[in-house]
Amino acid sequence: MRTYLYKLTSDRGGAPCAPPPRAGGDPLLTLSICKPAIRRTAQPGDRILGVTSHGLAATDGYPLESVIYAAVVAEGIEPREYYAQRSRFRSRPDCIYAFHQANGTLTHTGRTRLHDDRAYEARDIGRYPFYRNARTLLCTDFRYLGAGAVAIPAQLTRLRQIVQSLGQGHRVFDEKSPEAKELDALFKILWKLPSRFTPKVVEDEAYGHTPNRK
């Protein structure tokens, strides 16, 4: 089991995406855009920890060094399933691309402003024909806290130091990492809390930048 740690620069419901479930449905958190390196490599049973960045604290008032969401990966699925025309995920706010069976291409659906600039495609889905970044992570066991982000306890000193020094990338920890015990303790604390949900409708994220075109 590995734990992925990264900082969110925006939290408007696109990534992570965890809208309220339909009546009788089960809660689901997905990561289908942003953080392609995590989406490419995370496996079932791995954990993801998203924490507040200085930018998000400044723009949205989120508390610093706090957990916005934590999740356990249940499955990673390919774009031909997540973005299929009749996909069971089609109504989700982050299902913003369409897979065309005839030629194997992916295009933005155009039904939302979320990442509708083609500059996002390389990071979101990658290049045709392989679309290496188009993998989506499904998480049925999660805690999304949003603006109610929970501060990492002061006694978890090693973890707090790592979060303070973390930049735009991400860190990966395995069960033998010195931080493993603190991570386990944090997840136990978080799992005692009720989960919130992201908006049903997502207009756009608020990164304050657009990826450079390549």
Go through each PLM region and give its residues.
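Short coil-to-beta-strand transition motifs
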Residues: 61-72
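Short, charged beta-turn/beta-strand-edge "cap" motif at the junction between a beta-strand
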Residues: 52-62
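A general structural signal for short secondary-structure junctions and capping/turn motifs
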Residues: 38-41, 60-63, 128, 133-136
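Contiguous surface segments at macromolecular interaction interfaces
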Residues: 1, 79-214
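Loop/turn positions that initiate beta-strands
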Residues: 44-49
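Eukaryotic short linear interaction motifs
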Residues: 13-14, 57-58, 78-81
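Compositionally biased, charged N-terminal/linker segments
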Residues: 1-43, 195-214
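Short edge-strand/loop segments of extracellular domains
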Residues: 72-78
